[in-house]
Amino acid sequence: MDDLLAQQIEALEVAVPYCERISNAIGNVMEELNGHRQEDTDEYITSIFNGINWIIEVYNGTRELINKDSVIIDKDSVNASIFKLNAAYNAKNDVMLSDAFGEVKDFVTKFMETARSITDNK
């Protein structure tokens, strides 16, 4: 196994449990944004944004491995979801933000499942 592949596999191994935590956090914040806002919801959103950014960095560094045989996660779709999330956040619209988080959660889940599959079959 060459160094780049080993680094990609290691990154994916770390990403799997992290994606699980971020996915759960997204689900929680979606509930808060749908009428159950808490005092710290905005701080929670910022923390989740940081986690999503890290996941995107790992995705960008492993995209060739993830999409080795076919396009499993489309970069343009991911970018569109992130753009929608940013627009909803800037609009300060909780309903739009919850919907946008739902799309990003789909990406996080797909990335986690793909990463798990790759690391299980290394």
Q: For the regions a protein language model found, what residue spans apply to each?
A:
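C-terminal-biased regions
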Residues: 1-122
